[in-house]
A protein has these predicted regions:
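Phosphate/adenylate-binding glycine loop and adjacent helical scaffold
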Residues: 4-198
Length: 198
């Protein structure tokens, strides 16, 4: 189960732009995103479970062919769906696998690194771009490509299993299995090593 989100000592402050209600977690979490009149949310292909009210959907590659291809290499879908509301409505989202959802608010000062396959939805002001994790993740077999989320606004991520969030103080060390990492602040210093004799 992918179950952990890590952030540094100066956790990102709250900047809510959409109302999100998460229910039925941690095993089968369901997120209801309430859009104000004129509001839009970008959703991973296949993650929309329902809509209610005045909701229109538009499908695109969000940034063109190359950006869509980079998302595919990062474990996400080539296409994303934008759900917009003229007079207000609700978009319900759920992950493909059983598990939990987490509502994260970014203030634009720092990026959030998200494990490939964990991004579910965000406001259009959040840019989601694939980033190779480098040699330090190559030999781990996990997280070769991470998603780098930048901008200000709301973001929903999913985990296969329950989610637990940790705040690290300066200099603190937390050891995790790479298969259980959902997201972490870009400012968190990390390295990957083999466990045991494998």
């Amino acid at each position: 189960m992918r179950a952990i989100r890590v952030h540094g000592p100066d956790r990102l402050p709250t900047l809510g732009t959409m109302q999100v209600e998460i229910s039925s977690g941690p095993a089968f979490a369901f997120g209801e995103i309430t859009l104000p009149p004129g509001g839009t949310v970008r959703v991973e292909a296949g993650a929309m479970a329902m809509t209610r009210g005045d909701i229109q959907m538009a499908t695109s590659t969000q940034g063109g062919f190359m950006k869509g291809l980079k998302r595919t290499l990062g474990g996400e879908s080539f296409f994303v769906n934008d759900f917009s509301s003229g007079s207000g409505g609700v978009v319900g989202v759920a992950a493909a696998l059983p598990g939990d959802l987490d509502h994260i608010m970014l203030d634009g000062s720092r990026a959030l690194m998200v494990q490939s396959g964990s991004w579910i939805a965000s406001v259009p002001s959040i840019d989601v771009d694939s980033k190779w994790g480098g040699g330090k993740t190559f030999f781990s077999g996990e997280g070769l490509i991470l998603l780098r989320c930048t901008g200000a606004g709301d973001l929903l991520v999913s985990a296969y299993g329950a989610l637990r969030s940790y705040t690290l103080v300066a200099g603190e060390v937390l050891t995790l299995d790479t298969g259980h990492v959902v997201a972490f602040d870009e400012g968190v210093t990390y390295n990957v090593r083999k466990a045991g004799s494998w």
